[in-house]
Amino acid sequence: MFSKPIARILSIAGSDSGGGAGIQADIKTITSLGAYASTAITALTDQNTLGVHNILPVPPDFIRAQIRSVINDIGADAIKIGMLGKSDTIIAIATEIKQVTNRHPYLHVVIDPVMLAKGGIALLAKESITTLRSDLLPLANVITPNIPEAEQLSGKTITTVSDMCAIASYLHKTTGAAILLKGGHLSGDQVTDILVDTNEELYRFTAPRIQSHHTHGTGCTLASALATYLAQGVKLPDAVKQARLYVRNAILHAPQLGAGSGPLWHALSIPPPLPYLTEPPEKLK
């Protein structure tokens, strides 16, 4: 039994049939970190470690219905938003988020502005980027773009960590949200992420690069971990630090599955089975 209320995280994202990213990665991450995961699915994808092969969008009205069903019964302490697809989906989600945050102003909203799958398939229509900027991003507390996504959102090129700092500050000013700009696309032995919080304080997080092709779902996992830590009361800079560590360990313990970009291992914080669960069953006469 839980001794205190469990943090509730609603993930609004696409379903990954391979289980490495999207809703599946979100559920694994949130559960591993001790929170409760609920979902609103925006699209079904036919994918594996070799790439995304097909996408079936969920009708916007049905996405809204999923969100309302969760919020009106289970509730949420944080909402993580991932794959969106098209403008009508963005507008539908934004409409629901406005209603939810008006009733619950302390709700954390973390948006991972997913645009491309690792294989290069578009997960957000180019013509929808303007809608994303105008309708949804201003509703976020934290936005977690990688470098290509930040370039699309800002219209500027990023080639250095100094560029990252400038663009993160620019995106903060244009959205009002804290920006965690992920630097994994820059070359080098170190990976640097930049955080600009809502007080315009700048933080730099650096760690040695892990040489691995088992990195499918890192963005989804990071955003879900961040949303979970925030819902659990961790302050933003510390939540970023903890979320980055969780993703790093999930990469290091990747199960080596698939012939392409393999999934992470999310079950890091699950304790080993209790002794009575590993004993053989009692044989009854």
Outline where the language-model segments fall.
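Conserved N-terminal subdomain of the carbohydrate kinase-like
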Residues: 2-11, 31-111, 115-118
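Phosphate-handling active-site elements
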Residues: 34-38, 201-203, 229-243
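Conserved phosphate/ATP/ADP-binding segment of small-molecule kinases
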Residues: 126-202
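Charged C-terminal helix
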Residues: 6, 57, 237-285
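N-terminal basic/disordered segments at the start of proteins
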Residues: 19-35
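Short pre-catalytic strand/loop immediately N-terminal to key active-site residues, enriched for Gly-Thr
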Residues: 12-18, 202-216
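Short, small-residue alpha-helix embedded
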Residues: 151-152, 212-236
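Nucleotide and nucleotide-moiety/phosphate-recognizing core
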Residues: 88-102, 106, 177, 198-202, ...
